């Protein structure tokens, strides 16, 4: 089909938006593939005004809505020219070619355009990616801080438990030593005093004094 002809009358047709096409996929190829499911009224691949290259998506028009639904169910996820296609119902009709003539390249909204899901512009994609990255970073930071706080609380609880156990052991040891000292003092107080052994006094033999001569005379008389 020629790219310079005016668009056909697509009123009453059901449009399918086909995404993820390669640059070498042609309208004739798409027509041959989709005509297996019904009568195709038109195939349109938007192209860049300056490079004339495909934008990576196309629109396939069916005269019958049932044929379009069958084609969507069969071709969504199918592989064409090494790419996995994404096929969905288009929301709006095809814009005229005069829309992107004399005014430079078409707006970026037209790329996803009024034919189905509006494709996000690269700026929006970058913003969304940066936002998602910042959110993921903030989430990871919050998780890291939470884990840090949890580890700190755990270490604090462990240290407090250790100090408490040390205090308890110290108090137990001190109480045991006190009880031992008390028992020793009580046993000492209760035990009788030791009996001191007295050494026997050596009996000193008293020597009688020598008799006087007077006493000897009296005895003899």
Swiss-Prot record:
The yes or no answer to whether the keyword Nucleus is present is yes
Compositional bias of type Acidic residues: which residue ranges? 212-221
Any idea which UniProt keywords this protein has?
A: Acetylation, mRNA processing, mRNA splicing, Nucleus, Phosphoprotein, RNA-binding
Question: Per its UniProt record, what InterPro entries does this chain match?
Answer: Nucleotide-bd_a/b_plait_sf, RBD_domain_sf, RNA-bind/splicing_reg, RRM_dom, RRM_dom_euk
The record's principal subcellular location, in a coarse class, is nucleus
The entry's comment on post-translational modification says:
Extensively phosphorylated on serine residues in the RS domain. Phosphorylated by SRPK2 and this causes its redistribution from the nuclear speckle to nucleoplasm and controls cell fate decision in response to cisplatin treatment. KAT5/TIP60 inhibits its phosphorylation by preventing SRPK2 nuclear translocation.
Residue ranges, annotated region (Disordered): 92-221
Single GO cellular component term: nuclear speck
Entry's Gene Ontology BP terms: mRNA processing; RNA splicing
Q: Which residues form the RRM domain?
A: 14-92
Classification via PANTHER family: GLYCINE-RICH RNA-BINDING PROTEIN RZ1A, SC35-LIKE SPLICING FACTOR
Subunit comment: In vitro, self-associates and binds SRSF1/SFRS1 (ASF/SF2), SNRP70 and U2AF1 but not U2AF2. Binds SREK1/SFRS12. Interacts with CCNL1 and CCNL2. Interacts with SCAF11. Interacts with ZRSR2/U2AF1-RS2. Interacts with CCDC55 (via C-terminus). Interacts with BRDT.
Question: Which named protein is this?
Answer: Serine/arginine-rich splicing factor 2
């Amino acid at each position: 089909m020629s790219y310079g002809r005016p668009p056909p009358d697509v009123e009453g047709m059901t449009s399918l938006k086909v995404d993820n096409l390669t640059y070498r996929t042609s309208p004739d190829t798409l027509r041959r593939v989709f005509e297996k499911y019904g009568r195709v009224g038109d195939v349109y691949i938007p192209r860049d005004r300056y490079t004339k290259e495909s934008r990576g998506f196309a629109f396939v028009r069916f005269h019958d809505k049932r044929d379009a639904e069958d084609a969507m169910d069969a071709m969504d996820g199918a592989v064409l020219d090494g790419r996995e296609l994404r096929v969905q119902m288009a929301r709006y009709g095809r814009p005229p070619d005069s829309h992107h003539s004399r005014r430079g390249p078409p707006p970026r909204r037209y790329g996803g355009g009024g034919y189905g899901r509006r494709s996000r512009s690269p700026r929006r994609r970058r913003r969304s990616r940066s936002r998602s990255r910042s959110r993921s970073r903030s989430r990871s930071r919050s998780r890291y801080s939470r884990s840090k706080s949890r580890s700190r609380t755990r270490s604090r609880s462990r240290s407090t438990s250790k100090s408490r156990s040390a205090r308890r052991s110290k108090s137990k040891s001190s109480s045991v030593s006190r009880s031992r000292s008390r028992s020793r003092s009580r046993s000492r107080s209760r035990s009788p005093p030791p009996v001191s052994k007295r050494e026997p006094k050596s009996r000193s033999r008293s020597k009688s004094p020598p008799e006087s001569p007077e006493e000897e005379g009296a005895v003899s008389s």
